[in-house]
Amino acid sequence: MVLQYPQNKILVLSDHPHNFLKTQFLQDLFHCSSTGISIVKDQTWENRYYKVHFDLYIDSCKEIPVWVEEFITPECEPLRNVMAGIILITDIRQTKPQELLHQFMIAAHRNTFVVLANVNEEVEQDEIDELNEIWSNAFTNVIEFVNWKRSKPTVNHNDYGEKLGLDRIQEIIDTHDWLNCEVQPATKIREEIPNEMPLEQIIRNLQSARLKYKSIENSSEADAFANEMADELSRYL
């Protein structure tokens, strides 16, 4: 019997000598300020469609190719198999992704997304687009190069309306298939709004709503207000 572990880890790895870049990235993307530790447990990724809990792995290295050599060893297979995604913060002109990705992606789980977040200010979007075109069909995994420039914010979409920069990374995570994870639909999230309002408070709210309803002269506005209050109070009954 093969155990199916939840693929609920996202690794953020940086080879940049300045740690503030990784810190800023984690805050911007995950609203995470716990950058002094290597594992941040039970984070929440939530959008209008679903909510899921994941663990955030944070690491640094001097050279990503050296790190990859260790990551693709058989000993690291259990770790690779629980990775929802891996985000590499790097200078893509120094990393040379053509040499890096082939060995890396052969070992990575087929459902793991990989994002290379470029921090080289001289790299233009055209160069990023060329790399994405080359690697778009190389593997079944989502592999994407993204420009992320702290000193000059990246434009968040191109002429075709496609998202860029941090917005594109958010989109990749939003559309990720969270393998073996408990993904909570947005409708269920709404149902879990606390319904333990005291009875006295419910009565006071009804009385206040009745007074306001009687003060509204326009019948359409009054009906709209009544419906709104009915929906609001129904969550606590």
UniProtKB/Swiss-Prot annotation:
The keyword Protease does not apply. Keywords: Chromosomal rearrangement. Disruption phenotype: Displays increased levels of spontaneous RAD52 foci in proliferating diploid cells. It comes from the Eukaryota. Coiled coil: none annotated. GO terms for molecular function: protein-macromolecule adaptor activity. GO terms for biological process: vesicle-mediated transport. InterPro entries: Irc6. Belongs to the IRC6 family. Involved in gross chromosomal rearrangements (GCRs) and telomere healing. PANTHER family: INCREASED RECOMBINATION CENTERS PROTEIN 6 (PTHR28043:SF1). This is Increased recombination centers protein 6. It comes from Saccharomyces cerevisiae (strain ATCC 204508 / S288c). The gene is IRC6.
